[in-house]
Each structure stands twice: as structure tokens, then as C-alpha cells.
């Protein structure tokens, strides 16, 4: 047997560039019979290594490289598992090292785990004799071929391997530079570390003692460990009075079924079936464990989602409180979740509110023990973009070049360097000079290697034994992790549950809590009506900002066209709006509005597809069709569905024949059977799990219900979740204003870090103010809670410590209106800053001394700042306007002129704006033009004025005025902009509109009687303007008569209407 006993794979992170598949490929090509994986301190690569070896008839040997110490000296040591007990010892030894961040292993620690291991000390010198002597009674202790001779110790040839060929030695230097954040030495030739995979020819050229090579075979023969997959490692649930889990589960289920007062016989029949499947597969403990942790969450103020994935199709899950979706009511299939004909672990993923998810994990750790619960490792890899920058950095590329590299590699998921090389600009960069070609060569060698570890976002492993008995552990940022990935840990047989954090659940929970506290209303989301017409009106208008699953522009558009009328419409939309099924949306909407257009290939499809108007949307429908036509069990139907989605031609052909034969035996003609099979094959690729759609649609409905009935609380919490994003905050503020919600400035006595809903509106968060950080807000709020509300500005200044009370902070708070409630103008308070800063005697904590020793502080009253300046400061400090901006205020007053906002204006429509910025530039031809920033009081937009227009309006732009602009909308650098063709002052535009209007449209006739004498039945001369009435209730326009524009009462007539009720066209 030829064996390599010291392979370091790429999972020896940033120490080896040898991928497992390359090591095995080289072993096959060199007729190597056995390989030992010996990464330093870790066992990350064991499962992949084992699978690759077995697939290629290579004997896998499990080992690890460690550094053993006696406190004075350290010796590199390779330990190999002789058997499965030794493998478990490796798990525990690696876990001890990683959990305790050990760089070296004491000889005592190694001795604890050495009974079932082979120990090979490397490069042993005289200074290491004491360490080796400790293991003199250990029969399987060796020294490598480079060690000194010690009586009684055998030597073995052992070659360290961490890259493929001599030409790959540069990868080790590059990885070391990346790891240590140093530069790569490109001047001198790269050192050959002598750690490449030796060929048989190279080994024969070495002068190796034959006895040393013989010992290689001896050791390889002794090692006989293997990974065991699909073990039964489910933890046992502790039941009351040591009752069996099966009996206890049944007792709990029947008790709950009776309590819910459902149609007992129907539900009992389904329950018996599910219970039998679950217990026959041995999963009763699993369901009790999941039920227990969800019960803990619900009874400890942690909101849990209604369900996730296919688990909502289980009645057992519903009765145990794991889900809140009744599978019989919603026609959900248990077999989509758990299939007796496809034995796999059940997979229940759980959504918790993201801010309290850790509470549940902590509960599980406390219940089962710290070493019994862990997260799961994931690996970050040196993918194309990452490796390109990393290698560029260590080669000394400047920031400009690194940015150029980033710009040349497309932002495409999974892109490779080979794909990037097909792009001409990238190829030119590579061949620009020899240095770039060297860079590309190193990048290619390192591409795809694992770079670092991180924590899987949701997966938690639970066992009633210490986990290191089954898998090695390491330490993550927040607790223990398995050293193996999610799929690897599950394949071993370990129980994995996904604890997912869902932001929307946190929002719902916070709204419910605030409504109960402020309004005394206890909303039970399980009892809200799911046929609320106000909710469906909201959805039909596409007013879904902030609504889970429904807030994208595309979904809004679908909702407006569909006009949902019941909950099933929401379920359908969330399922259809994805790549693939989107093409069926027009068909679904058309048939939904006109069911007479629904056609079925066969009448027996109608009961299955009636609720979706003949369109196959859900995976469960595919299973139902297979069951109805081909007499498949639901288990067989689920296997068919999976086969269809995988597109395996051989399997598909087999399943096609199976389906057609089944349908023929069931009395269906072969032609219709083939058509039905092709129909479900078309949809199998993107059919959506209905159980998941129903669960997530329930969250969407709940959020819609809260938005309709408690809008202040809804928007306050949505806003609190976008703190830090100026753009999203501004969008949400504008949306709330459109809904008629009053946005109140930050209030020093009401506001805190999050937005605060109230009966009057929403108080802005102090945290949104630029320059005011979280710690400052915490100090202010804590002081207010402990010692009561602030009496005035001076009281605030006295009670807040110096380290927080800076001029910058005080100015920011004043200018956004945080002290407005004290009744002093912002300009007055700005004037008072010097008093509180200059007169500060650092005796804030003693109010009595303050009053005695400090001169009485007095306000010097000043007139309020101009509206425009207030708006300017609010925009500067908040990113949006709280007070009504002068432009917006003028827009409200002048909207009768038929003017537009930037957000809803179309090409060449008049828009009321002010110019925030005018940047004049000179073109290559020496002509002047300008880039401008337009402000309509709500939002800003970039604009451009080309030379011809600029020459025409240059003098006008020098005035600080309000303007009406029009032009064509365009995109520049993927940003919307306006190419301005015409500019007028508002006064000029109004004058022309009044003089030359073609039509007057009114929406309110209450003022008409006062001007009855002005209105003529027919047009008598050119100055007569048609007067029309638009009835919004019936969406109809009628002509009332004509009014003469030259009439002395014309302006009075116009001004007598509310600006929102009249338009001049």
C-alpha cells in the first residue's frame, strides 16, 4: 500500500491551497491507495474528504496536525484515528483546541485521547526527548524520517503536502500574505517549501530508508475509521412521569383536538394517519422537542410566525402549536412535509421575531446543556471578486487599480475568473503587463478556496449527548458551532432546526404592545377577521409599503389589477410573483375577473384547480392531480413532483410511463393522460409550496390589518426599522404624510431612539438627527425617565452632562424643533446656547447649588427663523422636511393652476420648484450650460439646462424665486433627471394661466350660486371659458356653462374655491 499520511487540505484555512478533489485526483493518478487528512487543529474537511476518497476507491484516513508542548518546547505532531473510537477522540481533541483557542496542546491533553490514535512526532530533536518519552508505553507512537533516533521508537516517512506541484509554491506565500495582511515578495523567486504532492517518480528518486516506507503501509493498514451517515441521533424528549414519547404525544394531540372544537371525526381521521406516519418513522420526540421550544417562546413574550415551509401542512404541527395554520381548512397536504415513501428527517423551520430570537436559543442551551447545543459553521470563499482584490492588495496594487478590478468583474452571482476573462476589457487588464499576468495566475490558483469561517444564519443543532461525540466543535462569535456545514451535520443524523429571525414579526409584536399600552386594546391576531373589506381596499390600491411580501413595485401593480377580495387572492399573488410563474399572472387575473374564461383539459381537474381559475400554482396541486388521475399515493406523487423539478431525463421517462399506466388503469385515455402529464411537467419547475404561501400570506394580511386600523403605530414601527437609511426614511415619511398622518418633530420630552406613535401623529426619533448618536440619546432618555420631563431648555442643559452637551448637539436639537414644545422660537434658543455653555459650572447634579451659584438664565426673545431656513435646516439634519416646506406650502395654495410634483409629473408638464443648486459649466465648444438641483418641497431631483436654454434663462436663474419648469425626464448614470426646456417664475405662469385658460373644472358646486350671473349658457366671444363640473362619485364630467375671463369678478370666482376643488386647464 502506498499512502500519504500528512495531507493539508484547503480547509487548513489560508495554510494550504490543495483542494480535496485535487488531492484525490492526484492520488488516483499516482496509484496511491490511502490518504490521511491532517489539517492543523481542525476537522472541517472530513465529510468532503471521506466522500471523495470513497468515490475514487481511496482509503480515507482521518487525522489532524497539532503542536504538542511540555511548557518549554513544542513539537509538530500528526495524530491519526485507528478506529471509530479514535475518530471520536479526534472530534473531542479538536473541540477542546478550538473551544479554548489553544495554540499548543499539552502532552497531558493528548494523552487523554491517545488510546485509539497513532501518534507521529515530526522533526524531533534532543530538546523534544522529554515529550516523546511521556508516550513510551504507547505502542503506536512514531517519529518521522527527519527526527533523531530514540531507543524503542520507530521512524516513518511522512511528507507534508499542502499544494499540488512545485509551480504552486507561490500559493502558500500568497495565502500567508492574505492571512497576515502583508505584502507578497515579487522580486525574489518564490521559495519551494517542499510540500507539493510527490509523484511516484519523485519518491523513487528520494533516498528513503525502506523500513520507513514499510511503516507507512503498516500505519495505513492500522487505520480503519469511517464516517457513519444517517445515524439515529434524535434526542429523547423528557416526558412527565417517564411516559413514552408516543403515548404522551397522542395524549397531548387528542386533548388539543377536543379543545379546538373542530369537526372531530374528520380531524381525528387525519390525525390518526399523521400520527401513524410520524411514530412509524420514529419522529415523535422531534415533534415534542419543537413544540416545547415554541411553547417557551409564546409564553415568554417572543412572537413566533404562523408557520414556514411545508410543515404548515401537518395537523400534528397545528395541534401542537408549532404552526397556526389549519391544514384541513386550507387544503394542505401532509405528504408534502413528511413522506412515508421518502424517508428523510422532518424539516421544521421556525420564524421568531428577530430582536428576541436569542432568548429561545438561550432557553435551548439551558435546557439541554451548553455542549449539547450549537450553531453551524459556514465558509466564506475566495470567489472571483474577493480573490481578485485580496491578491491585488498583497501585490501592492493601489486603490485606483483595485477599484478598476472591481469595476471590470460583473456583479453576477457565482461569476468565475474564466467568465470574466471572456470580457475584452478584463482580458486587456490582465495582459497590460507582466505584473498583471502574474496577478491573474495567482488569482486562478486561489479561486474557490475557503477563506474564513462564519456562522450559519439560522441553523441550531440539538442533542441529548455532548455534540463532540458525533462531530467536532469550534467557537463562534456567539457560542459553539459544529465544524461541519449544515448538510454535513444533518447527513450524520444530527437534529438541525432553523431558528430564523423575521423583522416583520418584531414589527407586529411592537405594534401590538404599543396599542395595548397606549389605547388599552388587546389585539389577538389569531382572532382578527380575515375578510376585512378595508384590508382588501388597501391591497387593491397597491398601498402596501411596509407590508411583508407585498411591497415591491411589481406586486403592487399586480394587486391593483387583481383587486383582491379574499385571503386566497393574497396566497395566489405571493406564489405567482416569482420568476417563471409570473407569466401566468395575466391569465390568472383575466380569469379571476371573468371565471367563464376558465377551461380545463379534463373535468376532473376542476375540483383541484377551481380556486386558482385553472392555473396550476401550488406543488400540492401537482400531487393532487397525480393522485386523482394516476391513482398515485400522495407519497408517490411527491416523489413524482421532485423528479419533475430535477429534470432527470431517465427518471422522468420512467415516471411518465408510471403515470400513464396508472391513469390507464384508472380509466383515463392514454392521450389525455399524456396531456395531463405534460401539463404538470410544465408547472412542476416553479410550483410553490402552498403551505408556505398560506403561512406567509397570513403575516402579510396581519400587517395590512394593522396598517389599516392603526396607521400611526404601523408607520412609527416601520420607520424605526429603517433608522440609518436616509433614503428609506424620507420615502416612508412622505408615504405617511400622504396617508394623512401628522409627522411631529423630535420632542425632547416624548421622543427616544425609536419613532413614537401617538394619537396626534408620529414623533420623530431623536436618533434620526445627524450628529446625535445612540449613546447621547440614551443619556437624554435615561435622565428623563429617572428625574422627570425637562421643564425648559435651561433645565435640559443643567441636567445633561458636559460630555454630551456640546454646541453641535444643542444646535442640532434646536434646529429640528426638539424644544419647540417649550414655546420659544428656534432663533431664541440658538441665542441661549452661549449662556448654557459659557456659564456651565459643572455642578449639574446639584440643582440647589446650581440655583444659588449660577446667575439667573434669561431668554432673549428673537423672531422665528424664516420658513425657508427652517426647512433648510430640517433637510440638513434629518434628510427630509418636517415643517411644510415653502415650495410645498405654495403648491397647496396654487394647485388650481394644474401644476405637478416631481414624483408624478410627466414630460413637458409644469412643475413648481425652487433651485437648490445651479452649477454652471462650459462645454467643449465654449458654451455655458448648467446642472441644477430642483426641490419641490417634498423631494429633490437633478436637472440639466443645455446651452440654448441656459442662454435664454440665465438671468432668470439669478433670482431667488419659485419657478415653474417643464421638460423631458431622462436617466443619467442610472438616476432619473429632468432635461429642462422651459422656465417661468410662478407669478408669470399664474398671470398667463388666468389670462389664457381654456377650461375651468370644479369639484364642488357649493360656491356656484354666488356667481350665477357670471355663468352663461353659451359661448358668446373669444374670452369665454368653458366651466365644467367633475362628479367624483360617478367619475363624470358635465358642462355648466361659460365664464368671461375679462369679467371683473373672474379672479374672485377663482379664489372663492378651495385650491384643491378647482383646476385651470
From Swiss-Prot:
GO terms for cellular component: cytoplasm. It holds the Pfam family DNA_pol3_alpha. One of its GO terms (biological process) is DNA replication. Belongs to the DNA polymerase type-C family. DnaE subfamily. Keywords: Cytoplasm, DNA replication, DNA-directed DNA polymerase, Nucleotidyltransferase, Transferase. SUPFAM superfamilies: PHP domain-like. DNA polymerase III contains a core (composed of alpha, epsilon and theta chains) that associates with a tau subunit. This core dimerizes to form the PolIII' complex. PolIII' associates with the gamma complex (composed of gamma, delta, delta', psi and chi chains) and with the beta chain to form the complete DNA polymerase III complex. The lineage of its organism: Bacteria, Bacillati, Bacillota, Bacilli, Bacillales. DNA polymerase III is a complex, multichain enzyme responsible for most of the replicative synthesis in bacteria. This DNA polymerase also exhibits 3' to 5' exonuclease activity. The alpha chain is the DNA polymerase. This is DNA polymerase III subunit alpha. The keyword Zinc-finger does not apply. GO terms for molecular function: 3'-5' exonuclease activity; DNA-directed DNA polymerase activity; nucleic acid binding. It is found in: Cytoplasm. It is an enzyme of class 2 (transferase).
Amino acid at each position: 500500500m502506498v499512502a500519504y499520511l500528512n495531507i493539508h487540505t484547503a480547509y487548513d484555512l489560508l495554510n494550504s491551497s490543495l483542494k480535496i478533489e485535487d488531492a484525490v485526483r492526484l492520488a488516483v493518478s499516482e496509484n496511491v491507495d490511502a490518504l490521511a487528512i491532517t489539517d492543523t487543529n481542525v476537522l472541517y474537511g472530513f465529510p468532503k474528504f471521506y466522500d471523495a476518497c470513497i468515490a475514487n476507491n481511496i482509503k480515507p484516513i482521518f487525522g489532524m496536525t497539532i503542536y504538542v508542548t511540555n511548557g518549554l518546547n513544542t513539537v509538530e505532531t500528526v495524530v491519526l484515528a485507528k478506529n471509530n473510537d479514535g475518530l471520536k477522540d479526534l472530534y473531542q481533541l479538536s473541540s477542546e483546541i478550538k473551544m479554548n483557542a489553544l495554540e499548543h496542546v499539552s502532552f497531558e491533553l493528548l494523552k487523554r485521547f491517545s488510546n485509539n490514535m497513532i501518534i507521529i512526532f515530526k522533526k524531533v530533536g534532543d530538546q523534544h526527548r522529554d515529550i516523546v518519552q511521556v508516550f513510551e508505553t504507547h505502542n503506536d507512537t512514531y517519529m518521522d524520517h527527519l527526527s533523531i533516533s530514540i531507543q524503542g521508537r520507530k521512524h516513518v516517512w511522512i511528507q507534508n503536502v499542502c499544494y499540488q506541484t512545485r509551480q504552486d509554491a507561490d500559493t502558500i506565500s500568497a495565502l500567508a500574505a492574505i492571512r497576515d495582511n502583508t505584502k507578497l515578495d515579487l522580486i525574489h523567486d518564490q521559495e519551494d517549501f517542499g510540500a507539493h504532492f510527490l509523484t511516484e517518480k519523485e519518491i523513487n528518486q528520494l533516498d528513503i530508508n525502506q523500513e520507513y516506507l514499510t511503516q507507512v503501509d503498516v500505519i495505513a493498514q492500522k487505520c480503519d475509521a469511517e464516517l457513519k451517515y444517517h445515524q439515529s441521533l434524535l434526542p429523547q424528549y423528557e416526558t412527565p412521569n417517564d411516559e413514552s414519547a408516543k403515548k404522551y404525544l397522542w395524549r397531548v394531540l387528542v386533548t388539543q383536538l377536543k379543545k379546538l372544537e373542530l369537526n372531530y371525526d374528520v380531524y381525528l381521521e387525519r390525525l390518526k394517519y399523521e400520527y401513524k406516519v410520524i411514530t412509524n418513522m420514529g419522529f415523535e420526540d422531534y415533534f415534542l422537542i419543537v413544540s416545547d421550544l415554541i411553547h417557551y417562546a409564546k409564553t415568554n413574550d417572543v412572537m413566533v410566525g404562523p408557520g414556514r415551509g411545508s410543515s404548515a401542512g401537518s395537523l400534528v404541527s397545528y395541534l401542537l402549536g408549532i404552526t397556526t395554520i389549519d391544514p384541513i381548512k386550507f387544503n394542505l397536504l401532509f405528504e408534502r412535509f413528511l413522506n412515508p415513501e421518502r424517508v428523510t428527517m422532518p424539516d421544521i423551520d421556525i420564524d421568531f421575531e428577530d430582536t428576541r430570537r436569542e432568548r429561545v436559543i438561550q432557553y435551548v442551551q439551558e435546557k439541554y446543556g451548553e455542549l449539547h447545543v450549537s450553531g453551524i459553521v459556514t465558509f466564506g470563499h475566495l470567489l472571483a471578486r474577493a480573490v481578485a482584490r485580496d491578491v491585488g492588495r498583497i501585490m501592492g496594487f493601489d486603490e485606483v487599480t483595485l477599484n478598476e478590478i472591481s469595476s471590470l468583474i460583473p456583479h453576477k452571482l457565482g461569476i468565475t475568473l474564466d467568465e470574466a476573462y471572456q470580457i475584452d476589457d478584463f482580458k486587456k487588464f490582465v495582459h497590460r503587463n507582466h505584473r498583471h499576468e502574474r496577478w491573474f495566475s495567482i488569482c486562478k490558483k486561489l479561486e474557490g478556496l475557503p477563506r474564513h469561517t462564519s456562522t450559519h444564519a439560522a441553523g441550531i443543532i440539538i442533542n441529548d449527548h455532548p455534540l463532540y461525540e458525533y462531530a467536532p466543535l469550534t467557537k463562534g462569535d456567539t457560542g459553539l458551532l459544529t465544524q461541519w456545514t449544515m448538510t454535513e451535520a444533518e447527513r450524520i443524523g444530527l437534529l438541525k432546526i432553523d431558528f430564523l429571525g423575521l423583522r416583520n414579526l418584531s414589527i407586529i409584536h411592537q405594534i401590538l404592545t404599543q396599542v395595548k399600552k397606549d389605547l388599552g386594546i388587546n389585539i389577538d391576531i389569531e382572532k382578527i377577521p380575515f375578510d376585512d373589506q378595508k384590508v382588501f381596499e388597501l391591497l387593491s390600491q397597491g398601498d402596501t409599503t411596509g407590508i411583508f411580501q407585498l411591497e415591491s413595485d411589481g406586486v403592487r401593480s399586480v394587486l391593483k389589477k387583481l383587486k383582491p377580495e379574499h385571503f386566497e387572492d393574497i396566497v395566489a399573488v405571493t406564489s405567482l410573483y416569482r420568476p417563471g410563474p409570473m407569466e401566468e399572472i395575466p391569465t390568472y387575473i383575466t380569469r379571476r375577473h371573468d371565471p367563464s374564461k376558465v377551461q380545463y383539459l379534463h373535468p376532473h381537474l376542476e375540483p383541484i384547480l377551481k380556486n386558482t381559475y385553472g392555473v396550476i400554482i401550488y406543488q400540492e396541486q401537482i400531487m393532487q392531480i397525480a393522485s386523482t388521475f394516476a391513482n398515485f399515493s400522495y407519497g408517490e406523487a411527491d416523489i413524482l413532483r421532485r423528479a419533475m423539478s430535477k429534470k432527470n431525463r431517465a427518471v422522468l421517462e420512467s415516471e411518465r410511463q408510471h403515470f400513464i399506466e396508472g391513469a390507464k388503469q384508472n380509466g383515463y385515455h392514454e392521450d389525455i393522460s399524456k396531456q395531463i402529464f405534460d401539463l404538470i411537467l410544465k408547472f412542476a419547475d416553479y410550483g410553490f409550496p402552498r403551505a408556505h404561501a398560506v403561512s406567509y400570506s397570513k403575516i402579510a394580511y396581519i400587517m395590512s390589518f394593522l396598517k389599516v386600523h392603526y396607521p400611526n403605530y404601523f408607520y412609527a414601527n416601520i420607520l424605526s426599522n429603517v433608522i440609518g437609511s436616509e433614503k428609506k426614511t424620507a420615502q416612508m415619511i412622505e408615504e405617511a404624510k400622504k396617508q394623512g398622518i401628522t409627522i411631529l418633530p423630535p420632542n425632547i420630552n416624548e421622543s427616544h431612539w425609536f419613532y413614537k406613535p401617538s394619537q396626534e401623529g408620529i414623533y420623530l426619533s431623536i436618533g434620526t438627527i445627524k450628529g446625535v448618536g445612540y449613546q447621547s440619546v440614551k443619556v437624554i432618555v435615561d435622565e428623563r425617565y429617572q428625574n422627570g420631563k425637562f421643564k425648559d431648555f435651561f433645565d435640559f442643559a443643567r441636567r445633561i452632562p458636559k460630555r454630551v452637551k456640546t454646541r453641535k448637539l444643542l444646535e442640532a436639537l434646536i434646529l429640528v424643533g426638539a424644544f419647540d414644545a417649550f414655546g420659544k422660537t428656534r432663533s431664541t434658543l440658538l441665542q441661549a446656547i452661549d449662556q448654557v455653555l459659557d456659564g456651565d459650572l459643572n455642578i449639574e447634579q446639584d440643582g440647589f447649588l446650581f440655583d444659588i451659584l449660577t446667575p439667573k438664565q434669561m431668554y432673549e426673545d428673537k423672531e422665528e427663523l424664516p420658513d425657508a431656513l427652517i426647512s433648510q435646516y430640517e433637510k440638513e439634519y434629518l434628510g427630509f422636511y418636517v415643517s411644510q416646506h415653502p415650495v410645498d406650502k405654495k403648491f397647496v395654495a396654487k394647485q388650481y393652476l394644474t401644476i405637478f410634483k416631481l414624483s408624478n409629473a410627466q414630460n413637458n408638464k409644469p412643475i413648481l420648484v425652487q433651485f437648490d443648486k445651479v452649477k454652471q459649466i462650459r462645454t467643449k465648444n465654449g458654451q455655458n450650460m448648467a446642472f441644477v438641483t430642483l426641490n419641490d418641497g417634498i423631494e429633490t431631483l437633478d436637472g440639466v439646462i443645455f446651452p440654448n436654454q441656459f442662454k435664454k434663462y440665465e438671468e432668470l436663474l439669478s433670482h431667488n424665486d419659485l419657478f415653474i419648469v417643464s421638460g423631458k425626464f431622462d436617466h443619467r448614470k442610472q438616476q432619473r433627471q429632468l432635461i429642462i426646456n422651459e422656465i417661468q417664475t410662478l407669478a408669470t405662469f399664474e398671470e398667463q394661466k388666468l389670462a389664457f385658460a381654456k377650461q375651468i373644472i370644479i369639484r364642488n358646486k357649493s360656491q356656484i350660486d354666488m356667481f350665477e350671473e357670471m355663468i352663461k349658457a353659451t359661448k358668446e366671444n373669444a374670452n369665454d371659458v368653458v366651466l365644467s363640473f367633475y362628479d367624483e362619485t360617478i367619475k363624470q364630467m358635465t358642462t355648466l356653462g361659460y365664464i368671461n375671463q375679462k369679467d371683473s369678478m373672474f379672479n374672485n370666482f377663482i379664489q372663492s374655491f378651495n385650491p384643491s376643488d378647482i383646476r385651470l386647464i
